[in-house]
């Protein structure tokens, strides 16, 4: 999302962390924006709408950005993430297709287990981040970013055609479902009231198809992008408003928008594609080496492996790091300097942390400046201020795992 102007500025939260092409006030939008199945629901609940990645989405509701953020950390919030691209990869060669595009080990995923992975190019750059789930229904369920919708879809469709021309059994289907994210420490408790399945048996990055508050055919995945426990629910369009309404009846739940989602993911040290990672960033530079499957590293059979794998054993020129500072908040594009005042890097995302009451950011610096505790300078509003390289996540994550 952009350093969005007027509408967002009046809300007291500047979406400077988001990529310029993605988010802006509706008054600035020239194209016809797409609407999620919950568009009227958002308006009825006081949603303040902005243009994001070609969609009209709520940046916040009646509560302040800070209140929404803290409510998610302490209770739970409901987010509409229906703008994200949901696809099914079908056929007996579905794993072969996906492993030809991503860095992760898809073949070793158990039924209904998922993983965060990366589309990469032959130069080692990251084309997008995505979640791939090996469903027990015999297909791969893929969720990727709205801002990369056309690029990701074309990438997968081209590979489908290539493999089909080789006689391979593979296909692709775009899902028309809505996608709701219920995030926060009480999310599972809230959802349990509406499902027969025991959510204690659904750990982080696993999923199951179930009826949720009377809506059948929902895929519930224990994941999210806030650092908290939570789920993402892929729901048939016809049941989306009913499901959101049913969840919102619980007093634990409040609606939250793009502003809270961005500050929550930043506190959790999670990347925003287009800002923190892009086609010119490798997984090693982006501190995402953990996404590289062990078998895939050894085989060097993913796009860009000849660039990426040697970086694991050697040194890269720069790394993504966390930063904390007092004073004015660091924003995307703020210059990072060493203590001698020489520019050495750039902030890619930044905001005041409602949880820590400090300013947090992430950015890229040369490896010799990447050790936690290293003191640096950040230029904010033409003034230099002290910043310290900090471990991420900035706040502890609370993902649910089986004991």
Swiss-Prot record:
Its EC number is 2.1.2.10. Substrate binds at residues 232, 261, 399. InterPro entries: GCS_T, GCST_C, GCV_T_N, GcvT/YgfZ/DmdA, GcvT/YgfZ_C, TrmE/GcvT_dom1. One of its GO terms (molecular function) is aminomethyltransferase activity. The keyword Transmembrane helix does not apply. GO terms for biological process: glycine catabolic process; glycine decarboxylation via glycine cleavage system. It is an enzyme of class 2 (transferase). It is found in: Mitochondrion. Belongs to the GcvT family. The glycine cleavage system is composed of four proteins: P, T, L and H. The glycine cleavage system catalyzes the degradation of glycine. It is linked to Glycine encephalopathy 2: A form of glycine encephalopathy, a metabolic disorder characterized by a high concentration of glycine in the body fluids. Affected individuals typically have severe neurological symptoms, including seizure, lethargy, and muscular hypotonia soon after birth. Most of them die within the neonatal period. Atypical cases have later disease onset and less severely affected psychomotor development. This is Aminomethyltransferase, mitochondrial. It comes from Homo sapiens (Human).
